[in-house]
Swiss-Prot record:
The lineage of its organism: Bacteria, Pseudomonadati, Spirochaetota, Spirochaetia, Spirochaetales. Residues 31-43, 86-106, 133-142 have a biased composition (Polar residues). One of the essential components for the initiation of protein synthesis. Protects formylmethionyl-tRNA from spontaneous hydrolysis and promotes its binding to the 30S ribosomal subunits. Also involved in the hydrolysis of GTP during the formation of the 70S ribosomal complex. Its main location: cytoplasm. Gene3D superfamilies: P-loop containing nucleotide triphosphate hydrolases (3.40.50.300), Translation factors (2.40.30.10), Translation initiation factor IF- 2, domain 3 (3.40.50.10050). This is Translation initiation factor IF-2. Residues 15-25 have a biased composition (Basic residues). It comes from Borreliella afzelii (strain PKo). One of its GO terms (molecular function) is translation initiation factor activity.
Length: 782
């Protein structure tokens, strides 16, 4: 390290010496020229034939300098104390010689011409300005200069090589071919594929979207689309391809397709049970029948409470489940609505029940919902017990009811059939005990059993949102026992039981078979009628729920109705189909379902109802915003809007209609639909006139001089021109005159002038029939 520093210092000194030498030469030249104006000095300068002589003398010492401009040679000599020295320079050969003595003499080859002297000593100038140069100059100066030049040359050479290397690398980068770049991209893609390899086999259902298939194959959707285009199939990223196309596409990448059924993945494996643990269970009884035939009254008698006080209009709005004890035995009753809108509820009631009690009024007899209940029970293969109600009324006719029901294969036992008939009066508490005895007898004959030690299985009867507790679902347990903390799947929803509340409103830790219970803990709102089943773990519940959601999406995608150009042209462009959009909110999911089905049935060729959104719960700000954006009205069934929702509805001018009885909701929507119907246009005959003269008025047209034979003729009336009993023209009266006056109408037996719009081919003897157009309001018919 110190050696390098010394070398650098030595180089610096040498550079300074060279610079000072150059400076000395300049000073000498300057003094030579300045001697011309200073004749008192001891310096002599002679010029002759392009030759210069310079001499200097001090203390007996002489010096001489000569320069030959033509020969470019010079000599220098110095004598001091008898010693001599000489210096010569040849500019062409760039060589120099130096000899030192105490006496300095500068001698030119030819000393001639004038001499000039100066008082300034050149020797003194050298000693004053650069005293170290002359004394330190030696024979090694040229070697040091060469060494310095060598190092400078090496440094310059390194810089040149560095520049050449940079240019060479740049040229190599720019000269890469497209093939090389493609190769690098392929190598990069290969590395990515190694990180996310394509599976050897892929499971799909009947069809799959390109994006989903790409996700399963760990590829980009654009790659699959490009491959399909190469195969001659044009698709978009969200378009579905069938299993055959998917198989061909996947095989292009060296994989295989397994067409599977998602239905298998949504089924929870049944628990292996010990049949010896199955014991007798209480019967589940569903009370069914037509509206207002006394079903709810019967159940209230069984419970010794008056449920009708809490039901709007005396109509059961959703399923009520209750358990009673009779003769030390439990019986669970389900009360289903009798209104036609609640078909799905009655169907579910029949599916989860053991016995159906069909209530028929002894006055009204068999009604539409009575027949429907019979069909539901037969479809579910459930035995029926007929309870003929209201026998206390004077107009009751039980035999008539038996005869009507026998037409539906419900033949009484006393008529030789196998159907149990019981005559009751729920109002007067007549025949109730006999009915309960028949129910228990039928249950004993059916040998109803269940295993309380297995995981619970049941059905979701209804669901609602409670402001204080969240989602609350009514569940009927068909088999097993449900405990607080159990993980479960309800339809496509999963959850964990947080609380169990029985029909008395009491929180319990568990519930056994054939019992209805309110379950808290659903992750989302299930649909009424969904299967309910407890799983081993919460992880399994989430997995089954996810698979069932995929299944719902798959099935809904298959059932999407396609819009054809014909439908689009007929219903939208011509405006022949009008639409009433509704956002439906109700207190429970069952009511939402029933009302939605009833409203969407109100459709004909001109108008239809479309429920754009429906859910259980209060009317919120989100519902109002949705209604405003979609131009819909909001219907609340047993629910009301929040304060903020009502304020927003007033601001957005959104109509909110609230109902407590389903009759009123359906009736009002029908009225709205009738107002949307285009009225019928009818032509009413008002009279006719005979053409007795034809007058052609220039710049006006042809005027028919007529005599009103019958009725009257009105201006703007629609006319039919009749000739020889045939209609030859139909048009509108554009002008009606009496003499020169315009009139609105002309009565019978008066003459008038009639001009028909855009018609001039009128002749004498023609008959002009006049009609008045009337619009008649339509009544809604489905």
């Amino acid at each position: 390290m110190s050696k390098n520093i010394d070398d650098k210092n030595e180089d610096g000194k040498k550079i300074k010496i060279i610079k000072l030498r150059k400076k000395v030469v300049k000073i000498v030249t300057h003094n030579d020229l300045s001697g011309k104006n200073n004749p008192s000095g001891s310096t002599d300068l002679h010029k002759h034939n392009n030759k210069v002589e310079y001499s200097h003398s001090r203390d007996g010492r002489t010096g001489g300098y000569s320069q030959n401009r033509d020969g470019r040679t010079g000599g220098y000599s110095q004598n001091r104390d008898g010693r001599t020295g000489g210096y010569s320079q040849n500019r062409d050969s760039l060589t120099s010689q130096y000899q030192g003595s105490t006496k300095k003499t500068y001698v030119a080859k030819n000393n001639t011409q004038n001499k000039y002297t100066t008082s300034v000593s050149f020797r003194r100038v050298i000693k004053t300005k650069v005293p170290s140069i002359v004394s330190s100059a030696s024979s090694t100066d040229s070697e040091n200069s060469k060494e310095l030049n060598r190092k400078l040359g090496e440094k310059k050479k390194q810089q040149q090589e560095s520049q050449k290397s940079y240019k060479r690398k740049k040229a190599e980068t720019e000269s890469k071919t497209i093939e090389q770049k493609v190769f690098e991209q392929l190598q990069k893609k290969k590395r990515e594929n190694l990180a996310n390899p394509i599976p050897k086999s892929i499971d799909i259902m009947g069809s799959i979207t390109v994006s989903d298939l790409a996700r399963k194959m760990n590829l980009k959707s654009s790659d699959l689309i490009a491959k399909l285009m190469a195969l001659g199939v044009m698709v978009t990223i969200n378009e579905k391809i069938d299993s055959d196309t998917a198989t061909i596409l996947v095989e292009e990448y060296g994989s295989k397709v397994n067409v599977v059924s998602i239905y298998d993945e949504t089924v929870i494996e049944e628990e292996v049970e010990d049949q010896s643990k199955r014991i007798e269970k209480p019967p589940v009884i569903t009370i069914m029948g037509h509206v207002d035939h006394g079903k709810t009254r019967l159940l209230s008698v069984l419970q010794n409470i008056d449920i009708n006080q809490t039901e709007s209009g005396g109509i059961t709005q959703h399923i009520g489940a209750y358990t009673i004890v009779y003769n030390s035995r439990e019986i669970t009753f389900l009360d289903t609505p009798g209104h036609e809108a609640f078909t799905m509820m009655r169907s579910r009631g029949a599916q989860v029940t053991d016995i159906v009690v069909l209530v028929v009024s002894a006055i009204d007899g068999v009604m539409p919902q009575t027949i429907e209940a019979i069909n539901h029970a037969k479809e579910a293969n459930v035995p029926i017990i007929v309870a003929i109600n209201k026998i206390d009324l004077p107009d009751s006719n039980p035999d008539k009811i038996k005869h009507q029901l026998s037409e539906y294969d419900l033949v009484p036992e006393d008529w030789g059939g196998d159907t149990i008939f019981v005559l009751i009066s729920a109002l007067k508490n007549i025949g109730i005990s006999e009915l309960l005895d028949m129910i228990l007898l039928q249950a004993d004959m059916m040998l109803l059993k269940a295993n309380p030690s297995k995981r619970a299985i049941g059905k979701v009867l209804d669901a609602k949102i409670d402001l204080g507790r969240g989602i609350v679902c009514s569940v009927i347990i068909e088999d097993g026992t449900l405990y607080v903390g159990d993980s479960f799947v309800g339809g496509a929803c999963y959850g964990k039981v947080k609380a169990l509340i029985n029909d008395k409103g009491v929180s319990v830790k568990s519930v056994g078979p054939a019992k209805a219970i309110s379950v808290l803990g659903f992750s989302s709102m299930p649909q009424a009628g969904d299967p309910f089943q407890v799983t081993k773990t919460e992880k399994e519940a989430k997995l089954i729920s996810s698979k069932r959601q995929d299944l719902k999406k798959y099935e809904s995608s298959k059932n999407v109705k396609k819009v054809t150009m014909l439908n689009l042209y007929d219903s939208i462009k011509e405006g022949t189909l009008k639409e009433l959009k509704i956002i439906l909110k109700a207190d429970v999911q069952g009511s939402v379902e029933a009302l939605k089905n009833s409203l969407e049935k109100l459709t004909n060729d001109e108008v239809r109802v479309r429920v754009v959104h429906s859910s259980a719960g209060v009317i919120t700000e989100t519902d109002i915003s949705f209604a405003s954006a979609s131009d819909a009205i909001v219907i609340g069934f047993h629910v009301r809007p929040t304060v903020k929702a009502q304020i927003l509805a007033d601001q957005e001018k959104v109509e909110i209609r609230k109902y407590n009885v389903i009759y009123d909701a359906i009736s009002d929507v029908k009225s709205v639909l009738e107002g949307m119907l285009e009225p019928d246009v009818e032509q009413q005959f008002i009279g006719f006139a005979e053409v007795r003269a034809v007058i052609n008025v220039p710049k006006v047209g042809v005027i028919a001089g007529c005599y009103v034979s019958r009725g009257l003729i009105k201006r703007d009336a629609i006319t039919n021109v009749m000739r020889d009993g045939l209609q030859i023209h139909s048009g509108k009266i554009s002008s009606l005159k009496r003499f020169k006056d315009d009139v609105k109408e002309v009565a019978e037996q008066y003459e008038c002038g009639i001009m028909i719009d855009n018609y001039a081919n009128i002749k004498e003897g023609d008959i002009i029939e006049a009609f008045e157009v009337k619009k008649v309001k339509k009544t809604f018919k489905t």
